[in-house]
Amino acid sequence: MDQNGASGSHPNRLSQGRGAHARERGATVSAAANRSNIIDEMAKICEADRQTFAIARRTRGHERLAVDNSDFVAVEDLILSYAEPTPEDQVEMIMSDFCSSPTYAEDEDEPSHESEPWFRFRNKRIRTYSRKRDPKSHKAVQNEKRRGSSGLSVQRDLNTSFTSMACDFDASSQKIHEVLLNLSQYFSATATASGPTPVPSQIDLPTEARQDSGDECFNAELENLRDDLLQSGFTFEASFYENEHEQEGPGTMADTIYGDSMQSVPTTRLRLESGKRNVWSDADSTLKKADVEIAENKKLLMGQTQAKNVDIEENTNFILEGIPLSEWLTPMELPEISKDVIKHIPDKKLKLEPSSQKEQKSSKDSNASKVRGASKQSCDINTKNEGTTILDQPNAAEQENLLNDGELLEEFLFNDWQPMQCSNGPSTSKNAIQGPKENINSINLDDKEQPEKQTPNKSQTISSHQLNGIRKKSFKFIEVSEEMKIKGEEFVDKVVSGLYHFSHKCNLRTEEYSDNHSQVMESTQCAEFKSAPSKPIEILDGKETYNAIAKVDVGEINGKFSPLNNDTIAEPEFCGFRTASNKAIPISEKMKIKTAEFMAEFQSKETIQQNDYLVHQPNDKPTSVGLDTALKRSIESSEEMRSKASKLVVVDTTMREPHQPTLDPVCRDLNESQFFGFRTASNKAIEITEAMEKRGAMFLAQSKATDQLNGWQPSDFPDVLPTSPNNEIHSINVENNKAVNTKTVSETEFFGFRTASNKGIVISENTKIKVAQFMSEFQAADASTDSNQPTVISEESRNIDAKFVDEAAAEDSANKPTFCNVQSLKNTSDIEHFKHDFFVEHSAKEEHPLCSQPLVRTPRRSQEIHSSLSQLAGKSPLDQATKKSVIARRNLLSLKRKRKIILSTETSTSCALPTMERFAPKPSSTSTPLADRDLNRSKDCTKNRQDAEDMSPICMQPKKSRRLGLSRSRY
């Protein structure tokens, strides 16, 4: 049984092993299949990722128009979107924004002594305004005081970087910061340790300007300029200061934004060439105090005293101290030796010697010229004091060569010349100078006896003392011709003799000056005049120049000094006018005759205008008066005009004597040519015919009659006008100083009104009837007012009144009756009836009790009232004239409406007194036309009101709300 069990168990084991192997194999196959599926999926994912990345690269830079179908996001996009910036990137961005320049490249060889950061202003110094640097020994004490200062101080944070300080403080904020620090330091210094900070009564701030800001001329600019000068090849001398840092003084340094201090530049000014020196004006130095400190430092360091000579150079602490940089950019000329300014000029005496003596000593061969300028004199200068002289030359030989006329006069300053008067030329001064005539004559004789000398060429030396002719400032000779020499001699003789002749009269006044000026007169001669740039002026020959100068000098001398002798200068008789150049205008006899005729005619015309005198002249055109026109054209005058002018003068004299009734026989001849009429602007007579005379008489008569008719009252008209059957009336007699009876003028009978142009207004029969009815009603109203009794008006009169009101309203429109002659009035009975009904008797007006009281009635002239209220839209409601017209128009419209209501009623009791209501006074009202305020209609209107829903918002009535305060509703 064991064998069977053993043999039976072996196939079972095989089957089990096969099953296990099959299961393992299936697991491996399934695992391999799963691996292949994962690889395929990864491949698909990579392919999708590749495609999405390619699409993202193509669409990068612009917005995607459509959303992706899948929700897949590329890894690169995630990295770029979620990457955080590093501190290095932020620093690079800030440096590129603020410290980079597109046109600037950094140097590779960066200097080691400059502090970071590097930016485009590396080689430039920023101007800063800092306080004075205190000595190093007191820095710790001041820092302790700052920590305990008051709340007004603004402390600088020591932990902040220099770059932030540069960004925070500019020029203006630095100045404010500095002022606050000074105030804080002042309050902290005055505070006591025990008690609180006391409040001082006043703050003693420094009044002088800051030395470190103006006097240092901005150390940054100085250093830059120093570098530029060193590059250009300039060299500076060694400094007198050995220890620069130890000898730092307060107020000489300035802090930069990087904390490093600007070192002083221990250099001196450049030494100029020998014979030249720097001359600076007072404006070049900015602060006097700095100059004093520099001078003291130099004395301590050098140990030597300053020499008296001005040529010794001043050594300064800085180069270009006190001189702005802008002044060095412009070229500057060094001052010449001859133009140096000497502040203390010693007293000098000028001794003038004749040039003839000098000429004999220097050169015997040279001869004096005939024409010699005023500068042809040599001068010796003797000084009293031992001070500096204007010219200091070592050799006497060089001094003799250089002291010629031109250079000698150039070396003198303008203020060195003492005022001195010379009598060798025309003088414009008021002081008379007298010189001996013998000396003058001797001078002239000597000049004439001297031989002529040739004009020097340009090749001659300038240092020679002799000069023939006139010389410019640039040492160029001017040739003088023989004619000019002769004219000059004659002119000098005339002027000198004339001056001597006139100055002899003032001998007593000028005795003290005779000795000095006699010497000058002997050695000086006047050649000719010179202009401002020393150019010669040609002298006119003849006696005109001499006479003009003599007259000027005589006038000046006679104006100041009274002559001893009673000799008067005979002036020529003057008759006429003078021009602007003081030239006499000759007046001939012909001009005198024309002027006399013109004055006679002018006086006669003026007399005629004043006395209203008419001169009759013939119609033919007379000749003109002999005067000159504006174009200097002569106007011929005839004998007839002269005779008329003489007659007019006689008439003028006779008219001024009213007590002599008889006229001169010459005036009787004027009746030959009678003149009656007017004249034109050109003095032409206007002929007046007989027809014009008749028209004028008719016009005067008619105007007088019109004035009388306008002045009459209605009660002054007579009942019947005297008329003839042929409709002819007599004109009114017009009296003008005498009764003039004019002849009767046949005209049509006139009765009615006239316009402003004297045209008749037509009055029709219908108008007459209406006016008569109107006046009857008016009289009836006045009578009823007197008796206070009601009057009954018939139905016929009411209808007529209604028609009259309607027609009157129609007449208010723009259509007005036309104007024409009053020829339609033929029946005199109608005229009498119209006049009788139109005018009110004067006695009735006096008996009326209400006539004396001003009544407000409807205006009678309805055509002057505005036809509608729309015409008042553009006018102000506050205008009084507009307000009155509105009230009058409203009263007229209400009158018509009431008349229609009264006429439409059946009973006559309701309208018992229509005339009283019509002419009754109306109460005053405002200019705004209001609606009808009938109490009976208000109740009916409430029933017919529409609901608010049915009405439009425009037509809806405003809701009345209760108003508080002082406001009132208008209605």
Swiss-Prot record:
Gene Ontology cellular-component annotations: nucleus
Q: Please provide the Gene Ontology terms (biological process) for this protein.
A: cell division; DNA repair; DNA synthesis involved in double-strand break repair via homologous recombination; double-strand break repair via homologous recombination; meiotic DNA repair synthesis involved in reciprocal meiotic recombination; meiotic recombination checkpoint signaling; response to camptothecin
Q: Give the domain of life.
A: Eukaryota
Compositional bias per record (Basic residues), positions renumbered to this chain: 130-139, 959-971
- Using the UniProt annotation, give all residue ranges assigned to the region (Disordered): 1-30, 130-155, 349-395, 420-466, 916-971
Q: Mainly resides where? A: nucleus
Work out whether the entry's keyword set contains DNA repair: yes
Q: Where is the composition biased (Polar residues)?
A: 1-15, 375-392, 420-432, 453-466
Spans of the BRCA2 repeats? 570-604, 671-705, 746-780
Disulphide linkage map: none
Q: What does this protein do?
A: Involved in and required for double-strand break repair by meiotic and mitotic homologous recombination. During meiosis, has a dual role in the repair of meiotic double-stranded breaks and the efficient activation of the meiotic recombination checkpoint.
Q: Which PANTHER family match?
A: BREAST CANCER TYPE 2 SUSCEPTIBILITY PROTEIN, BREAST CANCER TYPE 2 SUSCEPTIBILITY PROTEIN BRCA2
**Name this protein carries in UniProt:** Breast cancer type 2 susceptibility protein homolog
Origin organism is Drosophila melanogaster (Fruit fly)
